[in-house]
């Protein structure tokens, strides 16, 4: 059985990964239309219909949520609509229903964090849900937090014409990414007309009518709206977890390498089980938990082998260790290849980007790969397979990449790490 209090498919499908990709695709098409004259196409200045843009995004989410419902019926899984509460480690109640099970998996996800001095109101101060369903296009938009979510919204709203100010308290935007890639992303966003402030805090936000006044490093600034994207907290409350002894640390459920909590037979997966808060990590954790329950021998999750993607323009994708992290473990070799030297990138008029690879100098093991540019969110899986199979630098160098493709930049980056670059 499955207990769910909202839409099937969770945050990712309904209010996260999927609907935002619809919005960002709209922005990508608009950006290409604006640059069409460079390709010999004469197109009047494109305009957007905000209601239609939002409606398509919601329709996509609804279609896929319906698909999950179909899968539940097809596999004869009983749905209990409502909040599940533990009565003991083998029993939960959902409304008037009592469900007894030998094993229970908690997959309650996470919710956006507020800041003590900034509270989302849905009108002028938005969380991700409000930012996905705007009723107006702000002329001036403040985005607080420049992780993947903040950066994606910055790309969307900037492309559709808002003047975006992106503020991050850390020293770099995209704090989870390699600093060189993050710096390239920041420079690109600035070149696109955004204001990007790092190592900067937002001290106060006040709303007066249709105007929002923010105090940024002591200076008062006016905006039409703000998006708060400063991380998430696990949905651990009101489940009865404490009563049965499940250990919770810093707002997330503690689990072992097989997703087992501190209580035998109770598992946790996904965002509620801690970072990184990524849907593909959640799915894999679900498989690990179920394989363990049915007596198979699952491989534990290796968090250094989880790819991460940011669907901004330019896109960012990575897997493994950053250059700094890898360097702390020993001697490394680093390869770099700019997309400016890639034939396919030149042909499709999208040459902004870099592929960076990091190897263990003694073993040739691929420790990390970091990419920025067109299509990199689709290409990163090649490096994910390589790391998963523990491929060496020589095996990667001997691999034939098709021409002309953007993926050739991956090959050239590997060659670069060993001084064998061909096209740069």
Model-derived regions: residue spans:
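Rossmann-like dinucleotide-binding cores of NAD(P)H-dependent redox enzymes
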Residues: 54, 59-69, 133, 138-142, ...
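FAD-site-proximal beta/loop scaffold in flavoenzymes
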Residues: 118-137, 220-300
């Amino acid at each position: 059985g499955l207990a769910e209090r909202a839409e099937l498919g969770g945050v990712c499908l309904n209010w996260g990964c999927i609907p935002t990709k619809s919005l960002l695709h709209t922005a990508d098409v608009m950006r290409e239309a604006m640059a069409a004259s460079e390709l010999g196409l004469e197109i009047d200045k494109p305009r957007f219909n905000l209601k239609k843009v939002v409606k398509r995004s919601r329709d996509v989410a609804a279609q896929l949520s319906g698909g999950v419902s179909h899968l539940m019926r097809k596999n004869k899984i009983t749905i209990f609509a409502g909040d599940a509460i533990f009565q003991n480690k083998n029993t939960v109640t959902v409304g008037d229903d009592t469900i007894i099970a030998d094993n229970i998996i908690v997959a309650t996800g996470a919710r956006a964090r507020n800041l003590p001095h900034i509270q989302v109101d849905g009108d002028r101060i938005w969380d991700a849900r409000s930012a996905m369903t705007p009723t107006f296009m702000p002329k001036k938009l403040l985005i607080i937090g420049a992780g993947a979510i903040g950066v994606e919204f910055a790309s969307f709203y900037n492309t559709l014409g808002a003047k975006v100010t992106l503020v991050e308290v850390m020293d770099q935007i995209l704090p989870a990414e390699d600093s060189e890639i993050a710096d390239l992303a920041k420079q690109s966003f600035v070149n696109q007309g955004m204001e990007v402030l790092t190592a900067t805090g937002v001290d106060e936000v006040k709303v007066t009518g249709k105007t929002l006044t923010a105090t940024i490093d002591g200076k008062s600034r006016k905006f039409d709206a703000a998006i708060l994207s400063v991380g998430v907290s696990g949905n651990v409350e009101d489940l009865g977890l404490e009563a049965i002894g499940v250990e919770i640390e810093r707002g997330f459920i503690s689990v072992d390498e097989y997703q087992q909590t501190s209580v035998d037979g109770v598992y946790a997966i996904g965002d509620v089980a801690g970072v990184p808060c990524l849907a593909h990590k959640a799915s894999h954790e679900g498989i690990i938990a179920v394989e363990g329950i049915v007596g198979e021998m699952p491989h534990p999750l290796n968090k250094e082998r989880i790819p991460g993607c940011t669907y901004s323009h330019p896109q960012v994708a990575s897997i493994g260790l950053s250059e700094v992290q890898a360097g702390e473990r020993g001697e490394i070799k680093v390869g770099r290849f700019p997309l400016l030297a890639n034939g396919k990138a030149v042909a499709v008029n999208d040459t902004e980007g870099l592929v960076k690879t990091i190897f263990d100098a003694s073993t040739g093991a691929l420790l990390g790969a970091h990419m920025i540019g067109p299509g990199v969110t689709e290409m990163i899986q090649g490096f994910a397979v390589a790391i998963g199979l523990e491929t060496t630098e020589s095996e990667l160098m001997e691999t034939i990449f098709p021409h002309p493709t953007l993926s050739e930049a991956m090959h050239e980056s590997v060659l670069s790490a060993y001084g064998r670059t061909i096209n740069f």
